[in-house]
Amino acid sequence: MRLAFWLYEGTALHGVSRVTNSMKGVHTVYHAPQGDDYITATYTMLERTPEFPKLSISVVRGQDLARGTSRLPGTVEQVDKHYKPELIVVAPSCSTALLQEDLGQMARASGVDQSKIMVYAVNPFRVAENEAAEGLFTELVRRFAAEQPKTEKPSVNLLGFTSLGFHLRSNLTSLRRMLKTLGIEVNVVAPWGAGIDDLKKLPAAWVNIAPFREIGCQAAGYLKEKFGMPSITEAPLGVNATLRWLRAIIAEVNKIGAEKGMAPMAMPELRDFSLDGQSAPSSVPWFARTADMESFSNKRAFVFGDATQVVGVTKFLKDELGMKIIGAGTYLPKQADWVREQLEGYLPGELMVTDKFQEVSAFIEEEMPELVCGTQMERHSCRKLDVPCMVISAPTHIENHLLGYYPFFGFDGADVMADRVYTSAKLGLEKHLIDFFGDAGLEYEAEEPEAFTEPTMSGNGTVASVSSAEAPSEAAVVTATATGELSWTAEAEKMLGKVPFFVRKKVRKNTDNYAREIGEPVVTADVFRKAKEHLGG
């Protein structure tokens, strides 16, 4: 086990709770030590919903273990009496899994009707958040989905939308709007907002839509195997993907409609999908051809996150905005083969597969791309490196659980993504101009140091202050550095300061390498100029 510090995926406990907290009439009881109830704070902090998390902890104490007793039966009984759920899901934590207790036997001792209890005995040491969520949702579908007559009108199920999902409600709204324009009804959204009765009527829909590779695809596969329901698993990320998504839905609906003797469904006018019903549904196709966006054609981008978002965003950046992809990666090793298959021809090298944020940060520092699309961790790393970053995938923070309408799916989502790419990468120029010409009182940067000192910054961020009253010559003013690193004179640092901030670290690194090649122990203004000429800048 590794220290749980900045992990991309949560524990199995986290995955289970994402599913059950999404549903109506379902409550989770964790058999866990005190402290594992941190999960409830995660939902109250991030999930902007009026309901309290549907989670309870059956606390395991050392005193209980010594006595050979368990609080689980009593906790299950209390949950049943107080919350009156239709289903209680009992799950272990990492700690209680070591005890190898029979959760089923203890749950039966509660006296609660066993038809209302589901023991999900996932191995928390081998299964992480996404796999646990996918497994539980699939198990719920297996247990409750029942043969149903098909709806009279074309309808779909939207599978995989869960609590704490990335831009969950906005994405759901975007899909609902497009389906309404097509004249297709939504039969069930699950697990988000679904109850047990909703799971039972899943087979009534004509088509299943499961846009997330991480959760929903297995359930869609089961429904296809058991009830013969077709499914669409592509995520509508970007204009091109959205058009393919719409055509795929129409094709599947028309197949079933033909069997029923219905007239075929046609693609509506594209303007019908727009917010005002009059203009183009997305501004990306023309905006990508403007002078502003054409300047992005040579900008280098790196994408990292879960499988669904990485594939969709990478294709969007390259195919629709014309950006250069220097690399992509995912923290989900079990989805890596699928990501490689989807991104064949898009990547210059191997797909990065790692769950260590330090490795991702090191790659970003080495390559210094003009834009990083990543998770909350990449946002932190890029802030330190002065690299533009936009969050496109979980894990996220409060900034990505907004009250407003900010989808990533559909035509509306394409506009949101294009806006964020533009503002993330373009505003860097504004910061550089302020650095170069002065802030004109805008106080863009932190306050200047006191007037009597002249700070200089070394390559490793160490500051050496020189009094203006005794400012020595350039040759004497050398920044303090760690052992083995090159020193820079004040004038060289001043020249480096005129380089745009988003490539400044890379220029420093290249200049250091050049100075070592020519045997210069100190980077002076002259060495800096020579390095610039040598490197073609």
Curated annotation (Swiss-Prot):
Textual note on the cofactor: Binds 1 [4Fe-4S] cluster per heterodimer. The cluster is bound at the heterodimer interface by residues from both subunits.
Lineage: Bacteria, Pseudomonadati, Chlorobiota, Chlorobiia, Chlorobiales
Protein name per the record: Light-independent protochlorophyllide reductase subunit B
Active site residues according to the UniProt entry: D292 (proton donor)
Keyword Electron transport in annotation: no
Binding annotation for substrate: G428, L429
Binding-site residues for [4Fe-4S] cluster, renumbered to this chain: D36
Organism: Chlorobaculum tepidum (strain ATCC 49652 / DSM 12025 / NBRC 103806 / TLS) (Chlorobium tepidum)
Biological processes per GO annotation: light-independent bacteriochlorophyll biosynthetic process; photosynthesis, dark reaction
Keyword hit for Magnesium: no
